[in-house]
Amino acid sequence: MRKKRLPLQALQKAVRDLLTACQTTPLHEHVGETAKLPLIAFGEIRMSLSGAKDTALYRAEMELEVYSSTNSRSEINGILDDVATVLTAARLDMHTAGFAVCDQEITEVQTNPREVRGYDATLRLEVIIQDMEG
């Protein structure tokens, strides 16, 4: 049996580091009651391991949630465009944790008006990750 490590922490750190360095909307791991909008927050992460016996490959789906208090879609669309540009123009760096990113792409984006004021959105990022130590 092969040792298996989950790249959850490495993935979240790589996304946080890249987005913090390359765009201006604040990124939060947890959104408290006093958080100021607009902001980006980590949402759901799903991960599956490939059935290959000789290579540890993971398929991760990470959701980034975007919140805006502006009553037009222009702010949220601009933030989504910035995030999409960053995540498709630069490769996530997970090498220090012993993982390599084989592929990354945005698979879905959804925007919705909020009940009270503003808009929220979800951007889904799919990442194929190889465990270089496994």
Language-model segment annotations:
Residues 1-30, 44-134:
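Charged, amphipathic alpha-helical segments and their flanking helix caps
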Residues 36-37, 51:
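Short acidic/glycine-rich loop or secondary-structure boundary segments that cap or lie
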Residues 32-34:
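Short, glycine-/polar-rich solvent-exposed loops and beta-turns at beta-strand/coil boundaries
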